[in-house]
Amino acid sequence: MIVTRSWLNEWIDISTISTDKLVKTLNSIGLEVDSISSYEVPQKIVFGRVLECKKHPDADKLNICQVDIGVSTRQIVCGASNVRAGLDVVVATIGAVMPDGTIIKPVTLRGIESEGMICSAKEIGLADINSGIIEIDSSIGKYKIGEEVSQNHLFSDDIIEVELTANRGDCLSIRGVARDLSAAFDKPLRERKIQEDEDKRVGIGRILSLSHENNLGVNIRYKAVDFKNLTLPFIVRLRLSQLDDKKESDVESLMLYATHSSGVILRAYDYALFCAKDETMAKISLCRDKNGFASVMTKDKKVSIVGVMQEELFKVAHSNGVVLIEATYIPPDVISKKMQENKIPAGISYYRASRGSEPDLNQGLDYCISVIEDNSESSVYGGTIEIDEPHEDKIISLNKKEIDEIVGANIDKAKITKILKNLGFDTTKSLADNFVIIVPKFRHDIVNKQDIVEEIVRLVGIDNIPSKPFTFTETNSFSSDYYDYKKRVTYRHKAAFSGFFESVHFVFDEKKVLQEYGFEILDESKELLNPIVNTLDTLRSTLLCGLLRATSNNINNGYSSVKLFEVGSVFNSQREESLKMALIFSGDREAESLANTGKPAKVDFALFVQKVSNVIGEFELREYKTKHTLSHPYQCAEIFIKEVSVGEIFRLHPNVEQKYDLDVTYMCELNFNKLPNDLKTAKQSSKYQASFRDLSIVMPQEMAYEKIKNVIDASSTKELVRFYVVDKYSDKSLGENMSLSIRFVLQSFDKTLEEEEITNAMNTILEALKNQLGVGIR
């Protein structure tokens, strides 16, 4: 948003306020100044008046002018096409140093002496406003011939660019910024009202009729002007050039100027286009179009969409004749929602309408009409034709205590009331310390009591609020989400430390492959409607297929040993999500080296089990048949941790290994949510020596070790610390039996165990095995 000091001064008196203070104030009230630039016309450049103008005898494009510069009359040769007698101009006198460094000196042009230069805007350091010299008019205020141009506020000004947030549409105008400054400086906002003498003017109702649908949710107002010899004044041309935005016609430029100044969205229409043939009554209808937008129509043609765009055909391209001036307002939330639903092309007015334009339509119309009447012989039709739909007031209630608690400081009630009043809030219904606040229509961003307090803090100034230490009691900041995240990171790190590389896949898989191997698939009603590709046409119910493909790709790329893992989401037939972890080990058990003479052995079940144990800790394996067909029928087991089933481990079926060009391959899939995540707790250890004893027992080959383990665990031998298998043996002499060697570790917390105590403990275990399972020592 671009503003200038002189333009702001039209709406609020800042003549005694320095630019530095103005900028600091804008920043302090939340209107952040993005940049500031100043310009001042050099010395010895004065106002002049062309007394006489005649053609140069030896040059068609040059004119010889007699120019009054106050102290004397100077002869100046000028080549501008718009120079003429009676014109007030800007003259660079002898000795003036121009912005580009040129020094004005007496010269002779085609035999004619010239003492000075009649200047264009660009030549004195202003923005380029036209192709000729500056034409001075009354719009710049009072001036005297011969007076230094730099003494006029328009020729010595500051241009300030303010960076606005999207919710501050109320400051997308000079008047809007001035309104905030009036509250900050406690100065009144200047209003521009037109005193119409209705009896002397032709009523607009004689030339315009308006019909409309009900409940359109827009406010719209029309004025009619019969333009005669409209010429944009210098001040308008200069300011539009500073905005770097000028329209092709003077009328369109004037609408842009008045909109930027007042904040009201203004449009101009060619009156003749609204009249039927041989009729003088223009007819406008306002209705919703097929997309639900409030649209201006005439003769079944769309003229414009309120707050969005205007058809080029109905724009004004001339400066004479009757023109309809339209002022509109539509709530920003309404127009923004409509535009999100219907992606239609938008004009420049949408930017302002979607952020919140000025709802006081008279402000824009009065400002525009005053510029027209001051700078042309145009006549304005009396009255307006309008649709004025009421918009519900936003009322916010809060009390003094709430304000103080949010701010963290005690602010005087009278000061609060004054700030809110200066900002346009109505507090007349407030009682005692209870504020009942009616939000002004132009403040679309105010929706709750926190917004009200923010307005108070803006005007008080954050630097003027004393700092207070924040007192609080530290609580446990770790949530279940953190522990879930920590668990996932921990297991991923353990897998990486064990030599596995992480593999990451989409949560999609190929339905045909899942069905082929007997995995669960989505119910038909839950399937994907628009798959990315045919090979990713469903949600995965297992991580195994993805790891299998990744391993095959690595083997095909020349790797002889592949170890991968993945932690990710899977879905059951009802699209219910769960988390799983899977690991795969394929090919050589280790890299080629001198130790294995370059011929490493293949991975086996025991090695893979040990690798998985390094990741998830100790576990038991129990006999198990998988529900899918990826598994080898005789090399698969169920994994238990503390009597809880957490997953399965198996060798890949030889047919599947062959299909994917894999060597010996083992896989494991775990229910991640069932994996332990307990904090490690310290256990007391005995200071006395431990004793080791080995027992070799004869047992049937088909007997599960689990039975042996359960009997030993239940033997109630308190000295037994742990036990584990160290060897197994079978030969013909044992027949259908085998020998299993188990090592026992015995230890007491009270003393060093004596031989008799150790023997009694081992006998207790042997007796339990014999009585319950019928097995004994070899």
Swiss-Prot record:
It comes from Sulfurimonas denitrificans (strain ATCC 33889 / DSM 1251) (Thiomicrospira denitrificans (strain ATCC 33889 / DSM 1251)). Tetramer of two alpha and two beta subunits. It is found in: Cytoplasm. The gene is pheT. InterPro entries: aa-tRNA-synth_II/BPL/LPL, B3/B4_tRNA-bd, DNA-bd_dom_put_sf, Fdx_antiC-bd, Fdx_antiC-bd_sf, NA-bd_OB-fold, Phe-tRNA-ligase_IIc_bsu, Phe-tRNA-ligase_IIc_bsu_bact. Binds 2 magnesium ions per tetramer. One of its GO terms (molecular function) is tRNA binding. Keywords: Aminoacyl-tRNA synthetase, ATP-binding, Cytoplasm, Ligase, Magnesium, Metal-binding, Nucleotide-binding, Protein biosynthesis, RNA-binding, tRNA-binding. Its EC number is 6.1.1.20. Residues 686-778 form the FDX-ACB domain. Its cofactor is Mg(2+). Belongs to the phenylalanyl-tRNA synthetase beta subunit family. Type 1 subfamily. The lineage of its organism: Bacteria, Pseudomonadati, Campylobacterota, Epsilonproteobacteria, Campylobacterales. Residues 391-467 form the B5 domain. The keyword Transferase does not apply. Coiled coil: none annotated. One of its GO terms (cellular component) is phenylalanine-tRNA ligase complex. This is Phenylalanine--tRNA ligase beta subunit.
